[in-house]
Amino acid sequence: MSSKGPVQPPFAMTVSAEARAVMTPMLKQEPAPEITAMLMRNAITRKAVRAAAANHLKPLNKDRAKRFGVDVTKGKIAGVPVKYVRRKGTDAEADKRLLINFHGGGFMVDSGSLTETIPIAGLTGIPVVTVMYRMAPEHVFPAAVDDALAVYVDALAHRPPGAIGIYGTSAGAVLTLQLLVRIKAEGLPMPAAAGFFSGSGDLALAGDCEAYLPSILGSRTAPETLADYCVGTERTDPLLSPVYGDLTGLPPMLLMTSTRDQLLSQTVLADLALRRASVAVDLRVYEGMMHAFWAWIECPETEVALAAQAGFFARHVFA
């Protein structure tokens, strides 16, 4: 640690030139987590931040949709706003299977409802519904889980559980695991498979990597960053932090992270908790890459990660 902040190590030799180009400006940012939190707690500035994020992603997602050959429409399921993403040319037969996505963004911003779904719908041919769940600070836990559950229950009404998969990145991964323990608590059948990509199952304690890996969140850990989401709930409540509960009976899971992901430790700790519960897990750790790097489709490493995600769901989700 220097007087100017964390010392940034050189890139791993295996990291592509494209990934280096993406990561370099991120590492040069001067994060101001306290200011960010203040902006999100004010209704006017919060609206502006969310609008700016949407405007930034709009042209990128338009290009992604063209590249992966998908159509995107909006709708509602069980009263919950959603986006439907499906590969062009698919017929009603494709609807026998469904993937449900929960976007990232710290439970405060939509940073991935299309970046996380367009590639998977295009690669697998399985329609994807991304849930536009209620976000903090307006809506705290368990509002997002309630919305996720409502969409899942509707999916069960139209197809068997073996034809459904769920997944998410970052906050969406947190929500994925929270939904699974909620499904178990409600006595509902489990989906065929779940993807937990760069997330956390523990909102009470920070992981080791959060202490030293560079992040646009600055020095804030996952428990600190998600404080507004957790208001009013004991941090070790198993429905909020699933690693403190009984994880037996959960479906096969793919876990994904990278060695410069601030949530590397949290993903590994979730993997250990799932293994202790005899859940079939596949943990993929990618060398030298940043948090949720699969969102940057210009990186060769992303092609590898997306192929792993798509292959996992293709193997486990059957009509």
Language-model segments: what does each one mean?
Residues M1-T90, A319:
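A glycine/proline-hinged amphipathic helix-loop "lid/cap" segment
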